[in-house]
Design a protein with these regions (language model features):
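Extreme N-terminal starter segment of soluble prokaryotic enzymes
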Residues: 1-3
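A short, glycine/small-residue-rich beta-strand->loop->alpha-helix junction that serves as a flexible
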Residues: 5-15, 38-39
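Short beta-strand/turn micro-motifs composed of small residues
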Residues: 6, 34, 151, 192-194
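Donor-binding and catalytic core of enzymes assembling or modifying cell-surface/extracellular glycoconjugates
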Residues: 10, 175, 179-232
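Short amphipathic alpha-helix
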Residues: 15-23
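A short, Lys/Arg-enriched amphipathic alpha-helix followed by its capping loop at the start of a domain
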Residues: 22-28, 184
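A short beta-strand-loop structural module common to alpha/beta enzyme folds
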Residues: 29-40
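Secretory-pathway luminal glycosyltransferase catalytic domains
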Residues: 43-185
Length: 232
């Protein structure tokens, strides 16, 4: 059996689930481990069922028991300890019967050969969207120059994240991105998503901008749905 640890918010869960789909293609006895999600309070829990109606494939036990079982019986495979751009550790055959995978798999190389299945799996359930998001969907589908601009601040500006993400959360990064997009799209319409809309309005004044600020809490996934309907 292969167990794949799930943690993080919706985006990370999607990467991990895509990795699970690929693993399942070659190794039918694979399950998703939600044990850590029982204690994860940063985001909104495991969202694959609620947002995408994906089937239940989970394994979940209490944390102390899980750690004992993991230590005694499972061989651990860590994404961060593997060679860059190498899938060998995930594809090789192991004699150890129980394998435990930890990582975020934030690259299409982990599931490029099943990209159609991944896209089909991540189909948003529009029936669960609120009225404002549904109205915005109609606008986006008619706007041929719709450009989504997601500006994440908050946790990414904390010192512990600075080495990996801090540099892409600074004003020049977004200014350069807007300048580049203006070269590629004639009269772009910017649909802006952010966890700090006030900062965006003050620091990135745009003439043709719509600020999406109503999807909070368990409705946060609707921002991603709206982004997927932008042309860029």
């Amino acid at each position: 059996m292969r167990l794949i640890k799930v943690t993080g918010g919706l985006g990370n869960q999607m990467f991990i689930y895509a990795f699970y789909l690929r693993m399942k293609k070659y190794y039918p006895k694979v399950r998703i481990d939600l044990s850590d999600m029982m204690h994860y309070k940063v985001h909104y829990g495991y969202e694959m069922h609620r947002v995408f109606k994906l089937p239940h494939t989970e394994f979940c036990i209490n944390r102390p028991l899980k750690k004992i079982i993991e230590f005694l019986f499972f061989k651990k495979i860590y994404e961060r300890k593997q060679a860059p751009n190498s899938l060998r550790a995930f594809e090789k055959k192991y004699f150890w019967p129980l394998l435990y995978f930890k990582g975020f798999y934030q690259s299409e190389r982990f599931f490029a050969d099943i990209k159609d299945e991944v896209r089909e799996s991540f189909t948003f359930d529009k029936h669960k969207a609120n009225s404002r998001s549904l109205n915005m969907l109609e606008i986006l589908d008619k706007d041929e120059n719709a450009v989504s601009l997601h500006i994440r601040r908050g946790d990414y500006l904390q010192p512990k994240h600075w080495a990996t993400t801090g540099s892409v959360c600074q004003l020049p990064y977004y200014q350069n991105a807007i300048a580049e997009m203006s070269k590629r799209v004639t009269s772009p319409s910017y649909y802006i998503f952010s966890d700090d809309i006030v900062w965006v309005r003050e620091n990135l004044p745009l003439q043709n901008a719509v600020y999406i600020d109503w999807n909070t809490g368990e409705d946060s996934w609707q921002d991603m749905m709206l982004m997927s309907h932008c042309k860029l």
